[in-house]
A protein has these predicted regions:
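Helix-start/capping segments and mature chain N-termini
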Residues: 1-10, 33-178
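Glycine-rich, N-terminal phosphate-binding loop and its surrounding beta-alpha-beta segment
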Residues: 1-20, 26
Length: 178
């Protein structure tokens, strides 16, 4: 906690007066055993990133009014037996590969949508997937997706408040195209 406060304090001069901070904390496992003889500090490394929240939020605000283009990429979501999707980690090269693929598509506001290894909708590279149709929110089964605060808020709070049903199921790309 002290390190976060120290980082924010050192970065204050780079922020505008009313900026909110987006803090990302990455912790590595430390050196692999093959490097045990290297003469450096052993143990985990902590990286604290601090940047203005407006860099992401401000650039996305128009999407709430105009929507975005979902692009199904050739990059698949990593199945749960290889990496537990309940672990929110920052080491997701497959997300980067999907985003690079989408960045090559003509147009703007293109966002990657990944399929699971069976060809069903899994998730975006930084988002859960929800589709509203006939008073029902459809979302992928939780097998290969990050289950977190956003998903729980939509399912447990937002859907009931709006009188919407929620169905967790395998969603085919065809279902999204309709």
């Amino acid at each position: 906690e002290k390190a976060v406060h120290k980082t924010v304090e050192k970065n204050l001069k780079l922020f505008e007066k009313d900026d909110e901070h987006r803090i990302l904390i990455d912790v590595s496992r430390g050196l692999l055993s093959i490097y045990e003889d290297v003469d450096i500090r052993k143990g985990p490394n902590v990286i604290i990133a601090d940047f203005p929240l407006r860099w992401t939020v401000q650039n996305c605000s128009h999407l709430y009014d105009h929507g975005l283009n979902l692009c199904i990429t050739s990059q698949r979501a990593i199945p749960a037996h290889l990496m537990d999707p309940k672990i929110k980690n920052r080491s997701r090269l497959f997300y980067l590969m999907a985003n690079i693929e989408v960045s090559m598509i003509k147009g703007s506001d293109n966002w990657a949508l990944l399929l699971d290894t069976n060809g069903f909708i899994a998730e975006g590279t930084g988002s859960n997937f929800f589709m509203v149709k006939d008073n029902t929110i459809f979302t992928p089964e939780h097998r290969d997706v990050l289950r977190g605060i956003s998903m729980n808020t939509v399912i447990d709070d937002l859907a009931p408040a709006l009188g919407l049903n929620v169905i967790k199921k395998n969603i085919e790309p065809f279902d999204v195209y309709e």
